[in-house]
């Protein structure tokens, strides 16, 4: 309790007691190959591997930018299924350790969130909602098509495709998937709340972030967050989700705790934590 355990999350979670956790809050790997630790599949796409003709000419300039991640070539078609299979490896244990009525918040990439949802539902969770985290800024890695042709010396196509880009629109929102562990058949959710202390949400706390208590939230990082991780989430954002579904003294689990933002938030809010 109240510690960070270093090791394989898929193995360590097996020693956590059944129905002992009130909330699971985790920023899981998105499977989009943002960094080496986020590659969860076997991929032969030359651009993803940094060996496309344009990348070979440009050296390291494009190694971390403009990468086709999912469905951009026939080589990528297995990625969604492989991501589902990876999520399925831990979803069952998440269900086991969570109390009935307990919530799970999962930060998921927009491209593969549906595969995480399917894996969690197949494990036995109820998919409750998707919270939209609105961000003020976000990196935009859409490469100019005209620039590709310019580097190839193809001026005709460079002019023809001026104004077009490879990639996506600027990602100014991030989905937070909200799941719930079903309560026992024969009871009610109100009964479950009394027995297990979870199953409801605190609309008074949430209204401090969103006056309409809707499924939208806008929280930004501040100087106190001390970024230690490339995909680190603001502590204030983690606080909002913890306050939404738990009370003081309850236990928060983050199986993929990264820089520890979830645990910092839990400690600040007088919740117990495991990461």
What is the predicted function of each stretch?
Residues 2-275:
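Core catalytic lobe of class I
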